[in-house]
């Protein structure tokens, strides 16, 4: 039997670095939104190729805060519809619903498990204002075609990149830098996983970035002044320190995962077993 993902084995190699990071955390005494969060935000923005990265509590909150930010800036409003993949995790639907928007599920291509472009092109609903492609199993959605259609229809494009840390899309750009904004999860099972919960938003939009930075912290940008009706969804200082350590090995780990996936595709020949279309370039 092939063993399931062993998180202990993955994290044991970092024990010494994690201990040192914990000692630094205790010495600094910065428990909330300190230097470790700032460092990871800068590191991950640079890795993704975006101008901004905002650490939040989890992937669900990352998606919801993007929607809430766009509502504040008048690009979305309650009742607007959002196109999402029918084959995705429940958090995708929850984020849309919690933001007061309406999820519209669209069928996926059975070969890729990402948006079916024929079904997408057939959509004709003026109430749809945003498109949320999910890069499932680390395979980036067909973003070039999605962008063309979104520009024609005037849709916002938001990446659900919870399973696509380091995945490469159009023009060699990484997931997180392929749309107006992107949401990531650092749940322990992700290929960049924390030792608890965590998430982040990446974007090149300065207004959205600042808005989300406020929203995650009770709507506040300075102590005792709450500009927005916000949330409590901050990336944990200690998790940020651990993630910064693991980020250095992400490309190497992804390459190993791709090699394993290649092995399955080369050796599994059974009509009853459907594997995602291989995309071994990223």
Feature map (PLM): residue ranges:
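N-terminal "arm"/small-domain region of PLP-dependent enzymes with the aminotransferase-like
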Residues: 1-30, 35
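Active-site phosphate-binding strand-loop segment of PLP-dependent enzymes
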Residues: 111-194, 200-202, 207
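PLP-dependent aminotransferase class I/II
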Residues: 36-43, 47-53, 60, 118, ...
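Phosphate-binding glycine-rich loop
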Residues: 30, 34-81, 87, 94-98, ...
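Pyridoxal 5′-phosphate
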Residues: 13-16, 76, 257
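Structural detector of well-ordered beta-strand residues that form the stable sheet scaffold
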Residues: 83, 104, 157-158, 183, ...
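Hydrophobic "anchor" residues on beta-strands that sit immediately upstream
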Residues: 2, 81, 155-156
């Amino acid at each position: 039997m092939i063993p399931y993902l062993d998180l202990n084995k993955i994290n044991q190699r970092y024990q010494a670095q994690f201990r040192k990071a914990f000692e630094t955390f205790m010495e600094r005494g910065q428990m909330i939104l300190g230097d470790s969060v700032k460092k990871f935000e800068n590191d991950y923005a640079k890795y993704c190729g975006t101008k901004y990265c905002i650490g939040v509590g989890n992937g669900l909150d990352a998606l919801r805060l993007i929607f809430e930010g766009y509502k504040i800036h008048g690009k979305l409003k309650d009742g607007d519809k959002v196109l999402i993949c029918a084959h995705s995790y429940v958090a995708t639907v929850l984020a849309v619903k919690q933001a007061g928007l309406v999820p519209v599920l669209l069928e996926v291509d059975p070969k890729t498990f990402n948006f079916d472009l024929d079904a997408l092109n057939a959509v004709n609903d003026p109430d749809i204002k945003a498109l949320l492609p999910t890069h499932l199993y680390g395979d980036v959605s067909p973003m070039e075609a999605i962008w063309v259609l979104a520009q024609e229809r005037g849709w916002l494009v938001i990446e659900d990149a919870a399973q696509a840390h380091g995945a490469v899309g159009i023009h060699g750009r990484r997931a997180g830098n392929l749309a107006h904004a992107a949401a990531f999860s650092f749940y322990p099972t992700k290929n960049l996983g924390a030792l608890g919960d965590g998430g982040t938003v990446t974007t090149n939009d300065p207004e959205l970035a600042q808005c989300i930075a406020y929203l995650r912290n009770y709507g506040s940008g300075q102590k005792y002044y709450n500009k927005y009706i916000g949330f409590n969804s901050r990336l944990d200082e200690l998790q940020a320190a651990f993630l910064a350590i693991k980020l250095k090995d992400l490309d190497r780990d992804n390459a190993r995962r791709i090699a394993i996936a290649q092995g399955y595709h080369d050796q599994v020949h059974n009509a009853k077993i459907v594997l995602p279309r291989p995309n071994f370039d990223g």
